C-alpha cells in the first residue's frame, strides 16, 4: 500500500483528547511504519486569536517587566483558554465549567473566518505534507475544521473519533457534513444515525473509548506491587485519580472521609502534574502518591476499585482493568459527562454518590462489602474494549 499522511487534531483540555491521539498515533505507526502520522495541537495553532492568551499575555508582560529588577529568573507565562478548564480540575471544582461550553461555541462562531484561514494557511504551507486523512479527537471545532479542509481541497477525507460516550448537541461532536463518525458506544452511534447527517457506511461503532496500548499489555516483571509501595497486600485498596493534573481538594476530602470512617481502606493517589498534592501526601499513612507517569494501567492493576471524576477516559480505563468505580453526580457534573454516570448505573459498575464529603464513607463500606458483585457486573455487562485496534 502506498504511504499515507494522517493528521490527528487534538487539544489538552482534560487530557483525554491527547491520550486518544497518542494511542491512535502509536497503533497507526505500528501497523503502517511507512505512513506519516502528524499530531496537530489545535490550541497552539489558534493561540494568535485566543482571547484568554491575548489578555494574559498583556498582563503577564507587564508583571514580568515589574519583576525583572528583583527576580530576573521568574517569568510568568500567558494562559491558553484550555488552562482555565485544567486549572479548575486541579483545584477540584467543576462548578461553573458548564457555562464555558456556550462561551467556547460562541468564540468558534465569532472567529470562524479567522480559524479557517489559520488552518488553510497551514495546509497550503509547502513545509506541510498534504494529508490523506484529517482525524479529529476534539469536539466543538469539527464544523470549522471541515469547512477549512474543504476550502483547501475537496478530496481529503475527514473523520471524527468521539471521545465521549455520547454527543451533547447541538454543535458538540456531530455536524451536518460529509464525513466519517467513529462512535465508542451504541448510544452515540444511534445519535449519529438519528441526526440524518451521515450515510450509514460512514458511521462506525467501536467497542469503547480509545485506550492506550499499556492497558492491553500484561503485567511486567518489576512492576508496582502493593508491598513495594509500602501498602498492605491484603487491605482494600482504592486508586484515586482526577486526570493528569490531579485534584488537591477532592483528594484530601476523600482521604479524610476514609480515615474518619475507619474503614481500613488504603489508597494509591495518581497526582499527575500536581506537585502540591504529591508533596502533601508523601508521609500520609496508608497512602502512596504517584506523580505524572505513563503506566497508570500498572497501578490500576493492583487496586481494587477506582474513585475519581466521571470522565469517559478514566472510567473506561478503570472498568477495562476490572476496577469498579465510585463517582460523584451533582449539579457540578459537566453536562457531557452525565451520560457516563448513567453508564455506570445502568451496568452496575460501581456506586454513584451526590457528594464525596457527605456520602463517601457509606459508599466505601458498600464497595468493600460488594466488591465481588461489582467485578462480576463488569465481566458480564461490558464487552472487551478493543476500540483502538478496531
Annotate each predicted stretch with a short phrase.
Residues 23-35, 152, 257-263:
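A short, Lys/Arg-enriched amphipathic alpha-helix followed by its capping loop at the start of a domain
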Residues 301-311:
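Acidic donor-binding loop of glycosyltransferase active sites
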Residues 315-362:
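Catalytic binding pocket for nucleotide-activated donors in carbohydrate/polymer assembly enzymes
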Residues 23, 29-120:
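Conserved N-terminal ligand/cofactor-binding loop architecture of enzyme catalytic domains
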Residues 222-224, 229-302:
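Donor-nucleotide binding loops and adjacent catalytic segments primarily
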Residues 221, 351, 357-381:
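Conserved donor-nucleotide binding/catalytic region of nucleotide-linked donor-dependent transferases
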Residues 15, 20, 84-197:
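Active-site and donor-binding regions of nucleotide-sugar-utilizing enzymes
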Residues 179-245, 272-274:
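A nucleotide-sugar donor-handling region in carbohydrate enzymes
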Amino acid at each position: 500500500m502506498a504511504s499515507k499522511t494522517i493528521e490527528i487534531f487534538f487539544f489538552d483540555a482534560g487530557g483525554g483528547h491527547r491520550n486518544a491521539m497518542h494511542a491512535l498515533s502509536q497503533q497507526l505507526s505500528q501497523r503502517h511504519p511507512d505512513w506519516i502520522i502528524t499530531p496537530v495541537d489545535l490550541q497552539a495553532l489558534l493561540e494568535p486569536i485566543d482571547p484568554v492568551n491575548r489578555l494574559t499575555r498583556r498582563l503577564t508582560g507587564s508583571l514580568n517587566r515589574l519583576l525583572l529588577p528583583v527576580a530576573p529568573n521568574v517569568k510568568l507565562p500567558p494562559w491558553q483558554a484550555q488552562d482555565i478548564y485544567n486549572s479548575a480540575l486541579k483545584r477540584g471544582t467543576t462548578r461553573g465549567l458548564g457555562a464555558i461550553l456556550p462561551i467556547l461555541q460562541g468564540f468558534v462562531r465569532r472567529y470562524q473566518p479567522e480559524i479557517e484561514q489559520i488552518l488553510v494557511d497551514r495546509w497550503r504551507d509547502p513545509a506541510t505534507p498534504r494529508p490523506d486523512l484529517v482525524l479529529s479527537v476534539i469536539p466543538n471545532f469539527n464544523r470549522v475544521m471541515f469547512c477549512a479542509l474543504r476550502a483547501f481541497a475537496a478530496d481529503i477525507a475527514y473523520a471524527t473519533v468521539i471521545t465521549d460516550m455520547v454527543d451533547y448537541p447541538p454543535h458538540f461532536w456531530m455536524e451536518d457534513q460529509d464525513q466519517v463518525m467513529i462512535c465508542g458506544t451504541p448510544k452515540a452511534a444511534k445519535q449519529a444515525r438519528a441526526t440524518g447527517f451521515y450515510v450509514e457506511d460512514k458511521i462506525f461503532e467501536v467497542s469503547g473509548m480509545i485506550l492506550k496500548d499499556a492497558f492491553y499489555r500484561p503485567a511486567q516483571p518489576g512492576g508496582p506491587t502493593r508491598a513495594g509501595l509500602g501498602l498492605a497486600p491484603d487491605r482494600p485498596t482504592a486508586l484515586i485519580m482526577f486526570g493528569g493534573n490531579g485534584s488537591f481538594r477532592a483528594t484530601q476530602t476523600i482521604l479524610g472521609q476514609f480515615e474518619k470512617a475507619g474503614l481500613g481502606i488504603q489508597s494509591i493517589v495518581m497526582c499527575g502534574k500536581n506537585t502540591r498534592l504529591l508533596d502533601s501526601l508523601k508521609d500520609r499513612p496508608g497512602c502512596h502518591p504517584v506523580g505524572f507517569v505513563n503506566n497508570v494501567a500498572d497501578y490500576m492493576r493492583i487496586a481494587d476499585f477506582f474513585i475519581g471524576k466521571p470522565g469517559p477516559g478514566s472510567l473506561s480505563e478503570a472498568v477495562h482493568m476490572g476496577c469498579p468505580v465510585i463517582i460523584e453526580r451533582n449539579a457540578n457534573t459537566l453536562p457531557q459527562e452525565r451520560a457516563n454516570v448513567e453508564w455506570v448505573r445502568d451496568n452496575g459498575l460501581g456506586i454513584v454518590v451526590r457528594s464525596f464529603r457527605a456520602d463517601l464513607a457509606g459508599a466505601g463500606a458498600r464497595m468493600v462489602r460488594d466488591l465481588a458483585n461489582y467485578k462480576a457486573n463488569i465481566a458480564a455487562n461490558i464487552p472487551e474494549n478493543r476500540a483502538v485496534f478496531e
